[in-house]
Amino acid sequence: MKEIVLASSSPRRRDLLKQLGLTFRIMTAGVDETPPGGLTPAEMVEVLAGRKAAAVAGMLEDALVIGADTVVVLNGRVLGKPADREEAAGMLRQLQGTDHTVYTGVAVMDAASKKMQVAHEKTRVFFKSLDEHEIRRYVATGEPMGKAGAYAVQGRAAAFIKGLEGCYTNVVGLPLARLADMLKKFGYNVL
């Protein structure tokens, strides 16, 4: 079977791939993560996932490269990763007491043939109401930094989640069922 390469330095994506029992290595490439204008959130994450996979695949002769990108969307506005703690707190103030949608784009590219599959998953997340003290304490943990929407569903923010509609691993950053189906189309069975 072909080597699997994860085009991401995300510890969460690494851990999710390990859950599938896959043997893989991690490689990243400097990719412009500025999406072209005028795209829907689904199109945006697919484009960025494809860029990441293609950039790493271009450095390899023969491997299946996985790229991914995740955003949180609230009332039509995309919330990416917060730049600082104040922005993280602001995002959490917006998300508290509402529901929002998490989109993750996934791309799998065969470095040898240059064939690529791109897809996305979306999950609806319901947040409970939070007070300012809870938001400040959570931000002080540092956990919101580097995460779309300023929260980690698999971490302390699990206490904020009332429910989900859709794929849990999508909210973590990599929809495993979707990825397994994509890999299968390249002849790679995870089981």
UniProtKB/Swiss-Prot annotation:
InterPro entries: ITPase-like_fam, Maf-like. It catalyses: dTTP + H2O = dTMP + diphosphate + H(+); UTP + H2O = UMP + diphosphate + H(+). Coiled coil: none annotated. GO terms for cellular component: cytoplasm. It holds the Pfam family Maf. Keywords: Cytoplasm, Hydrolase, Nucleotide metabolism. The record marks R12, T70, Q154 as: Important for substrate specificity. The active site is at D69 (proton acceptor). Its main location: cytoplasm. Disulfide bonds: none annotated. It is found in: Cytoplasm. Its EC number is 3.6.1.9. GO terms for molecular function: dTTP diphosphatase activity; UTP diphosphatase activity. One of its GO terms (biological process) is nucleotide metabolic process. Its cofactor is a divalent metal cation. Belongs to the Maf family. YhdE subfamily. PANTHER family: BIFUNCTIONAL DTTP/UTP PYROPHOSPHATASE/METHYLTRANSFERASE PROTEIN-RELATED, BIFUNCTIONAL DTTP_UTP PYROPHOSPHATASE_METHYLTRANSFERASE PROTEIN-RELATED. HAMAP family: Maf (MF_00528). NCBIfam families: maf. Nucleoside triphosphate pyrophosphatase that hydrolyzes dTTP and UTP. May have a dual role in cell division arrest and in preventing the incorporation of modified nucleotides into cellular nucleic acids. This is dTTP/UTP pyrophosphatase.
